[in-house]
Amino acid sequence: MSRIVLGPQKSAKHFFGPKRAHVLVAAMAAALCVPAVGISSGSGLPTSIGKGEGQLNLIAWEGYTQPQWVKPFQKATGCQVHAKYAGSSDEMVTLMRQGGGSQYDGVSASGDASLRLIYGHDVQPVNPNLIPDWKNFIPALKSPPHNTIKGVHYGLSLQWGPNTLLYNTTKVKPTPSSWASIYSPKFKGKVTVPDNPIQIADAALYLSKAQPSLKITDPYELNSTQFNAAVNLLKQQKPLIKKYWALASDEIDLFKNGDAVIGASWPYQTNTLIAAKVPVKDEIPKEGATGWADTWMMSAHAKHPNCMYKWMAWVSTPKVQAQQAIYFGETPANPKACPIMNKLSPGSAGQYHCGASASYFNSIRFWKTPVAACGNGQNDCMDYTKWQQAWTQLKG
């Protein structure tokens, strides 16, 4: 969302400010969650979208509910949007479970939260056929494994992008080309990274190249030896950290004030800082990058399901996809947004890899929830609970 962002996870304190068990859900339960739509007797999913209920309560990454696309949506649908920004995927999961899960209608979940929400019965299946632009999404994001289980869709893909290395061009020389720079004593007290357990994956990705003897092949599937190596690297980094940032705006302030000169970031921060005349650039280092692929998901107890469906349809359109992509600095799920991006901001489609090849998409190690079952058929990986525990202990 931490994300870049979309993007850390991406503290939730702002509204409309600047800016990633069991699967089965009974069909009747799904029907009850959508009281004002047409229901198919076969799937239990709605077959049409009814009249909006008048409001929509969302949990979102900072920068995902901007007035330029929210205000037209409200005018067109009558659904008044109330958005709460979350600073991490962990926070999103917690917020979605508040008040019995009925406080919010939807969430812009990243891949390290979406499966937790599905398996925790916090979100409900949706009918993607009610979203006209879903058919235009890139193939990899129509039914991706982070939001679609055994053919059942639990949300609509939105945007995706890489986590980047952000640096002040006047203070950091030579130009950094490796994630090693954020672990270097050279920048002691001037480094900032997301306040997010998923940072362990970023450390693991770096170590996969820096220490090949660890044999790390997937930064989210770590045995105890690999996991401890990543955590130890982050412990060594801790004295260098100025602040672990929660909101994107926290990191923006650190760079504006000169309190940080290098760190892990999202393109959103880069765009905002450049607009504010702060001398920064970002890079995808030679080791590669982790990243996010976000999904709008509907609460299992949504009070305004029609407005949520209308919102998912709205943000899937080429124009809104283009607006958000440019604003945040990410890539649309809908490639029909690419020419609109170039009209709004010449060259932006190429800049953010809109319509990029599948090989580029596959080169990003997208967030996913760490589980004990490793890809090697073993059950010896550290699950997300251990990641959370290690991160909490690390920060003290």
Cite the ranges covered by each PLM segment.
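Extracytoplasmic ligand-binding site segments that recognize negatively charged/polar headgroups
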Residues: 59, 64-66, 90-91, 103-104, ...
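Conserved C-terminal helix/tail region of periplasmic/extracytoplasmic solute-binding proteins
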Residues: 362-396
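A ligand-binding cleft/hinge motif common to bilobed small-molecule-binding domains
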Residues: 113-116, 264-279
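Short, low-complexity disordered leader/linker segments with a strong preference
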Residues: 1-55
